[in-house]
Each structure stands twice: as C-alpha cells, then as structure tokens.
C-alpha cells in the first residue's frame, strides 16, 4: 500500500474489528450508508487492490438500505454466520480452523496489550487480531516505539491471521446468502494481503 497512511489503515482495522465483533445497531447501520462513509470508501478505492472489494461492499450496503427490517435481518445473518455451530457457519476464531489459539495471546503480551473484560469472546476471536493490527499501525504513526520492533510484531500478527483468514472468508462467501459479511470479509482479506506484502 502506498497512499494510505498508517493511521488510515489503523482506522480500517478498528472499523472492521467493530463490525465483526457484534451485531450492527441502528446507529451503525445509518453510519455505513452515510455520505461520510461514502467519502471513506472513495479513499479506500484509491488503492487499486481494494477497489473491487470496496465496490462490492458498497453494493451490499445499497441493497441493505432497501431491505425490510435491515437491522434484524443483518442480526440474523451475524448470528447464523458467527455464533452457531461450524457446520454452516464461518466461526471467527483461529481455533475453529485448527490454529493455535494461544498465538494471539503471545502476540498481545509482546505488544503490551490484553483483552478487555468487556469483550466476552475468546482471545482468538478475529476482532482481537484486528484490534492488535489497528494498535500496531497507530503505533507506527506515532513513532514512540522503534518502527522495526512494531513492524516485526505486525508481520507476526499478519502471518498468524493469514493461516486461517482465507478459509474464514471462503466460509463467509459460502454461507452468507445476503452477502454483507461476505463482502466485508473479502475487503478484510485484500487489506491483510496488501498489508502483509507491504514489508
């Protein structure tokens, strides 16, 4: 990635963490369809690798705005995809994809972070990885910790996430019939891939 700043990438990761951590409320639903978000999406589309994924997400959002009981339907999609058994779902946990659930805990310790007591999910939840990546990108922009140390931890986190993210995204595509979370996960996949290549 060349045109997005470390802070902008951090914001994208934080935003995605929020959307994958809990069902959207009315305020979030209004926000994702707002003019402000359209500007943000326009900025993201200035990065060629992200363009197609952002376009698809915008299409899903446009369809969402005319969906009857959009929030309730999206909540049902969230529940079906992320909270049910793994037979027809895309569980957002590293351990669901035969990955070491302790790896994220080690990465958090290395970053001087810990999970919040307010987040009632296991530490290997996708949102924790994304929050860590957001934190690391913000730290890169601040310059208070040596960039080499932050970048090393960022690469370790991206590598750990990449071990299971493609399968998670494939399952989102397979089981999300409406497609909002499938599009969101595709944007995440492309972002992580670009971030990983930007060594």
From Swiss-Prot:
InterPro entries for this protein: Chaperone_TorD, DMSO/NO3_reduct_chaperone, HscB_C_sf, TorD-like_sf, TorD/DmsD_chaperones
SUPFAM superfamilies: TorD-like (SSF89155)
BP term (GO), one: protein maturation
GO cellular component: cytoplasm
Single GO MF descriptor: peptide binding
Domain of life: Bacteria
Subcellular location: Cytoplasm
Major subcellular site: cytoplasm
The keyword Metal-binding belongs to this UniProt entry's keyword annotation: no
Keywords linked to the UniProt accession: Chaperone, Cytoplasm
Function text: Involved in the biogenesis of TorA. Acts on TorA before the insertion of the molybdenum cofactor and, as a result, probably favors a conformation of the apoenzyme that is competent for acquiring the cofactor.
Membership in a protein family: Belongs to the TorD/DmsD family. TorD subfamily.
Protein name in the entry: Chaperone protein TorD
Source organism of this protein record: Escherichia coli (strain K12)
